[in-house]
Swiss-Prot record:
CDD domains reported in the protein's UniProt record: TPP_DXS, TPP_PYR_DXS_TK_like
Function description: Catalyzes the acyloin condensation reaction between C atoms 2 and 3 of pyruvate and glyceraldehyde 3-phosphate to yield 1-deoxy-D-xylulose-5-phosphate (DXP).
Enzyme's top EC category: transferase
Species annotation: Xylella fastidiosa (strain Temecula1 / ATCC 700964)
Protein name: 1-deoxy-D-xylulose-5-phosphate synthase
Length: 635
């Protein structure tokens, strides 16, 4: 348990209104307590860690100066919002983040009135905040709207689309965008000149001159004097920082400012609150600030399991091979014999298992940053020239490049292999990161071949099969580990569109897809039912399905995808096209966005673990229950 006597100031803060009761001179002490509390609480529970440590001062400054929740803060991605949650009535629950029934890992509108926009994917904040600012302007509402976006999220085109729109509007919306630059990707250093410039561009004097000039000379580009003054200011600032881009897009740029210097932050924000039109504040922060180990390993401490802050993360010993590990090994093995192979990732080198490949084949590795649309069309272009690109991407992020998959890859039947990680139920990261829809939205695309492995060995074979197939292919595999079937070192392929009969039985045929083959087989063998590892969602094994339809009374399809339009729907469509009338029971994920919990709990909740499949069968066919087949035997 956390001893709140160690946090005398933080213990007095339940809402931002309580924070505003402190004197400015006390905020440094509040920040120190908040940072230490974050370290202690996340150490107990696990969760996103380093990003939140980097925005402690910024979060305090925003809630201190802005009248939240009337003024609206829109956070991008959400990894950095633990301090925000702590200051907005959720301090005592922060250790429940990512746990079933606990706080969401990202901002969630249903959770708090201070969470103005739900998020989990990157680069949405400016668009959402602009929408809010436009409505406020139309309603004559003086509320302030602030978007907080990291420099990583600024690699996505959507952010620039929003900046371009906001900066070109007339009348101009009152919108503040805060660029949280924690990787020095925009400014290489915060030296003396840039510090001086940050103070100057954020000063009342310069802004008074600028605003006075607008009133005297006008703000139109056709006014020669105003145009000259604007160009002079841009030239002066452009010598020191890359502000010209934002200024050209119609934003008044302030910064860069040290994001851990509370007086500097407060001073700049006080000035910016008085200005009209689109504003951009550039702050420099350190991810993991205040915890030396996190500052030194920002990737390793991005998201953590529970740990002792006094000792830091302890490297795990030998662990069971994950599906991501299988992909990682296959990719390097295939690259060794196939010079055409090129690998692409949208900023997920570690998560998608590309670290080893990037080290062994740096000239064949392409990290395009958070740019899923570009990643897929880049792969399409490579394929037109005879290369075989492999796009390693999470299922949830593939949604962002769906048009490119359809229009640029599938329509042209280009040889692109999609290694779709985190398919199906994902777990603690919640609805924003779930892969519950991919079988549905991939199955309907013409020319697309789609596979889902039942185990690790099959995953490797499917990747090889997809690599050698002529046309677009997706191999969709889950987060975490599988049954433990060790893959061979060979690069064997599977016959396309051929399922695997796992067990011959009577009456009922259980058709399992991907991870659902294991519970289907566990239950089917116990009850004497036929069990099939379908392997292919598209094309389905037509020959086997027609044979089973002639010899069985009913089909039961089992998949970790929403039932609507999923793999089971494909089976029903095939039988319908053949004029076969046969009862089909579809077991899968619900028509709902599942919330955060462990994968095991979510699979059980959906009724597609072994116990759930068993219960579903007995509810429809009670005669299957015999003394030797108790529910507890398969739970």
């Amino acid at each position: 348990m956390i001893d709140f006597t160690c946090y005398p100031r933080l213990s007095r803060i339940q809402t931002p209104e309580d924070l505003r009761a402190f004197q400015e001179s006390e905020l440094r002490a509040v920040a120190d307590e908040l940072r230490n509390y974050l370290i202690e609480s996340v150490g107990l529970s696990g969760g996103h860690f380093a990003a939140g440590l980097g925005v402690v001062e910024l979060t305090i400054a925003l809630h201190y100066l802005y009248c939240t929740p009337i003024d609206q803060l829109v956070w991008d991605v959400g990894h950095q919002t633990y301090p925000h949650k702590i200051l907005t009535g959720r301090r005592d629950k922060i250790s429940t983040v990512k746990h079933q029934g606990g706080l969401a890992p990202f901002p969630k509108r249903e959770e708090s009135i201070y969470d103005t926009f739900g998020v989990g994917h990157s680069s949405t904040s400016i668009s959402a905040a602009l929408g809010m600012a436009i409505v406020a302007q139309r309603n004559g509402d003086e509320r302030k709207v602030v978007a907080i976006i990291g420099d990583g999220a600024m690699t996505a085109g959507m952010a620039y689309e929003a900046l371009n729109h906001a900066g070109g509007m007339s009348p101009a919306p009152n919108l503040l965008v805060i660029l949280n630059d924690n990787r020095m990707s925009i400014s290489e250093a915060v030296g003396g000149l840039t510090k001086m410039l940050g103070r100057a561009t954020g000063s009342k004097a310069l802004n008074a001159i600028r605003e006075g000039g607008k009133r005297i000379f006008g703000d139109k580009k056709t006014n020669a004097t105003a145009r000259f003054l604007r160009r002079w200011e841009e030239h002066w600032k452009g010598m020191f920082v890359p502000s010209t881009l934002f200024e050209e897009m119609g934003f008044h740029y302030t910064g860069p400012i040290d994001g851990h210097d509370l007086p500097a932050l407060l001073g700049a924000l006080k000035t910016l609150r008085t200005l009209k039109g689109p504003q951009l504040l550039h702050v420099i922060t350190t991810k993991g600030k205040g915890y030396e180990l996190a500052e030194g390993d920002q990737i390793g401490y991005h998201a953590v399991a529970p740990f002792d802050p006094q000792k830091g993360l302890i490297k795990a010993g030998a662990k069971k091979q994950t599906y991501t590990d299988v992909f990682s090994e296959w990719l390097c093995d295939m690259a060794a014999v196939e010079p055409r192979l090129l690998a692409i990732t949208p900023a997920m080198r570690e998560g998608s298992g590309l670290v080893r490949f990037s080290q062994e084949y740096p000239q064949r590795y392409f990290d395009v940053a958070i740019a899923e649309q570009h990643a897929i069309t880049l792969a399409a272009g490579m394929a037109t020239q005879g290369a075989k690109p492999v796009v390693a991407i999470y299922s949830t992020f593939l949604q962002r490049g769906y048009d490119q998959l359809v229009h640029d890859v599938a329509l042209q039947k280009l040889d692109v292999l999609f290694a779709v990680d985190r398919g199906g139920v994902v777990g603690p990261d919640g609805a924003t990161h779930a892969g519950n829809l991919d079988l549905s939205f991939l199955r309907c695309v013409p020319n697309m071949m789609l596979m889902a492995p039942a185990d690790e060995a099959e995953c490797r074979k499917m990747l090889s099969t997809g690599f050698h197939y002529s046309g677009p292919v997706a191999v969709r595999y889950p987060r975490g580990t599988g049954p433990g079937v060790v893959p061979s070192a060979e690069l064997d392929v599977l016959p396309v569109g051929v399922a695997q009969l796992r067990h011959s039985g009577t009456r009922i045929a259980l058709l399992g897809f991907g991870v659902c083959v294991a519970p289907a087989e566990q239950v089917g063998r116990r009850l004497g039912l036929t069990v099939v590892n379908m392997r292919f969602i598209k094309p389905l094994d037509r020959t086997l399905l027609l044979e089973l339809a002639r010899t069985h009374e009913v089909f039961v399809t089992i998949e970790d995808n929403v039932v609507a339009g999923g793999a089971g729907s494909g089976v029903a469509e095939l039988l319908n096209a053949e004029g076969i009338v046969l009862p089909i029971v579809h077991l899968g994920l619900p028509d709902a966005f599942q919330q955060h919990a462990s994968r095991e709990d979510l699979l059980a909740e959906a009724g597609i673990d072994a116990a759930g499949v068993y219960a579903a069968l007995l509810s429809r066919w009670p005669d299957l229950a015999v003394q030797n087949h108790p529910l507890s035997a398969v739970s």
